[in-house]
Amino acid sequence: MYKWLIENDKYYNFCISYKDYETYKRDGANVDKLLVCPNGAQHRDYHFTEKPLKPSWTLYLGRIEPRKRQYLYQDIYGVEFVGKYTDTTSFDRNRDCYLGQWEHEYKLQHVTDYGNMMLLSDGENGTPLVIKEALVAGLGVVVSKYAAHDLDTSLPFVTVIPDDKWEDIEYVQMKLIENRKISVTMRKEIRQYGIDNFSWQKLVKTYVENIEGMK
C-alpha cells in the first residue's frame, strides 16, 4: 500500500502531519499531489474549567501498549492512567492508578479535571490527537519529542522529556510537578493555544483551501 501511495500520480494524498508529508516527499512521492491537513479536536465538545478538580494529578490517556510506555511510570504518585488495556506490557491493571477505559462522552467531560497530561511514547505520527484534546481542555503537556512535532516547545506549559531521561523516574516526576504548577495558572491561555492551532474551527478552513486548490 505504501509503495502504491508513493508511486501514485493520479490521486491526492492528505497527510495528517508534516512528518508524513516529509516522509512521502523523501521517498519520492509527487509533491504536487501531497496536501497537509493536520488532525485536530472540536474544542466546543470539550468541557473546560479554569480550576481543575485534580490540580495535583497528571492524566496519562491512551491505549496501554509498549509504544506508549505506561508501564515505566506506574510507580509515580500523582499519575492516573486511562485507556484500553492490552496484556503486552508489565503494566498492572489492578493498581488504583489505572481507571480503565473511558467512554467518549465521559472523556469529553473529564479530561479538564487534571492539572496536566503526559505521553512519553517512542513513536508517533505527528502530534497525537490526545495531546490536542488535552490542550483544548486547558491542560499543559509533558511529552516525548515524538509526540511534539506540531507543538511550540518554547511555551512554558509544554515540557519535552529527552530520550535519555525516559527511565529516570525522579527526573520525569520532577518535570511533571513543574509543568503542573505552571499549567494550572495558565488554563485559559493553554486552551486558547489549543483552539488557535488544533481546533477544527481552524483546520476545516485548511481542508477547504486544500480542496479548492486541487488541480
What does each model-identified segment do?
Residues 112-126, 139:
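Acidic donor-binding loop of glycosyltransferase active sites
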Residues 1-14, 27:
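Membrane-proximal helix-turn-helix segments that form the acceptor-binding/catalytic region
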Residues 155-167, 176-180:
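Conserved acidic donor-binding segment of nucleotide-sugar-dependent glycosyltransferases
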Residues 50-68, 74-80:
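Conserved donor-binding/catalytic core segment of Leloir-type glycosyltransferases
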Residues 131, 140-144:
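Short hydrophobic beta-strand element within catalytic cores of glycosyltransferases
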Residues 108, 131-136, 150:
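Short alpha-helical segment that forms part of, or immediately flanks, the ligand-binding pocket
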Residues 164, 180-212:
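A charged, aromatic-enriched C-terminal amphipathic alpha-helix characteristic of glycosyltransferases
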Residues 25, 36-56, 91:
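Acidic anion/phosphate-binding donor-loop and adjacent secondary structure
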